Regions:
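Short phosphate-engaging motifs
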Residues: 144, 188, 233-236, 294, ...
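PLP-dependent enzyme catalytic core of the Aspartate aminotransferase-like
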Residues: 19, 26-28, 35-36, 44-46, ...
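Conserved PLP-enzyme active-site core in the AAT-like
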Residues: 1-5, 9-197, 202
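Residue-level detector of secondary-structure transition/capping positions
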Residues: 64, 189, 245-248, 306
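A short, terminal or domain-edge coil/loop segment
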Residues: 76, 101-106, 151-154, 249-267, ...
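Conserved C-terminal alpha-helix-loop-beta "cap" of PLP-dependent enzymes
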Residues: 200-286, 290
Length: 309
């Protein structure tokens, strides 16, 4: 999630003495905002297993100003029942904020499922070319005018005109790019699921995903990202990453170019080992963002890298 978009949308509604209930499976920087920064401002934060509606209900029983979650989560692909969590959050007197980066505006529509605010790192799929940094916040006109507008007007975290223009140009091709990326990601996920050197594949579009049925209800497709464990641990994982030729190593995602990263040592390196373990982020986990290259070329690069010594 874009830090400015994410922190900006929570601060107008969250004040010292109030509570934020969040799923624990978050992008590393967002986890830092929720778990470390908000408490410094006197805001109580509670992290729950986002898949467990009972955990949400228990945490929200004491009231909350904001509920927050990612679905699918980065990088373990946890799917959250957005409609159910929205109902529970509203019952507690709060608003639900959803980070919809992995799903994009095309594959999942949290506002239609009951969320109040949706945030995007526009740097990802919306730009799609790795050219600029930016975030986007979607909400009701009343929320924008009464809560978000004054905060932005007086603190100034606004896009430059040039970056805004780049993102608008990116939106023109978003549907075409995401459709191609999703098809490629699905093909890679199916291929890896049967590979002897892969011990686990996490992709919402696979029937083997533990929340496949929920993903089918909430999302139009499985998305453009695949996460998987390379058998053999960290050393084998790094060998695989270093051997890729067509795919670049980068923390970005949603780009026209296929990208991979090692979450345990990059996006989630700030977390303690036991925290990463609870989120299923092991040393063997790879996050793969499918780009626009030819599907056969990507599969060949992956196969060659897996067989490298």
């Amino acid at each position: 999630m874009c830090g400015r978009a994410g922190s900006g949308n929570k601060k107008p509604r969250s004040r010292a003495g109030q509570r934020v209930v969040s799923s624990r499976a978050l992008f590393g920087s967002c986890h830092y905002i929720v778990a470390d920064l908000l408490p410094r401002w006197g805001i109580e934060t509670v992290l729950v297993d986002g898949r467990d509606l009972g955990a949400w209900e228990e945490a929200l029983a004491g009231g909350a100003a904001v509920g927050f979650c990612e679905s699918p989560s980065n990088p373990a692909m946890e799917i959250i029942d957005l409609a159910a969590v929205a109902r529970l959050t509203h019952r507690a007197g709060g608003i639900l904020v959803v980070d919809n980066v992995f799903a994009t505006p095309l594959l999942q529509k949290p506002l239609a499922l009951g969320a109040d605010v949706v945030v995007y790192s526009a740097t990802k799929h919306i730009d799609g070319q790795g050219r600029c940094l930016g975030g986007a916040i979607l909400a009701s006109e009343k929320f924008i005018e009464d809560d978000l507008g004054p905060f932005y007007r007086h603190t100034g975290p606004s896009l430059s005109p040039f970056n805004a223009w780049l993102l608008l140009k990116g939106l023109e091709t978003l549907a075409l790019r995401v459709e191609r990326q999703c098809c490629t990601a699905a093909a890679i996920a199916h291929y890896l699921e049967g590979h002897p050197k892969i011990s686990r594949v996490l992709y919402p579009g696979l029937p083997s995903h533990p929340q496949y049925d929920l993903a089918q209800r909430q999302m139009k497709q499985g998305g453009s990202l695949v996460c998987f464990d390379v058998a053999g641990g960290k050393e084998a994982c790094f060998r695989f990453l270093d051997a890729l030729q067509l795919v670049d190593i980068s923390n970005n995602l949603g780009d026209s170019k296929s990208l991979v990263t090692h979450p345990a040592t990059t996006t989630h390196s700030r977390l303690k080992p036991e925290e990463r373990a609870a989120l299923q982020i092991g040393d063997e986990l790879v996050r793969f963002s499918a780009g626009l290259e030819g599907e056969a070329d990507l599969l060949a690069d992956i196969e060659r890298a897996l067989n490298s010594e």
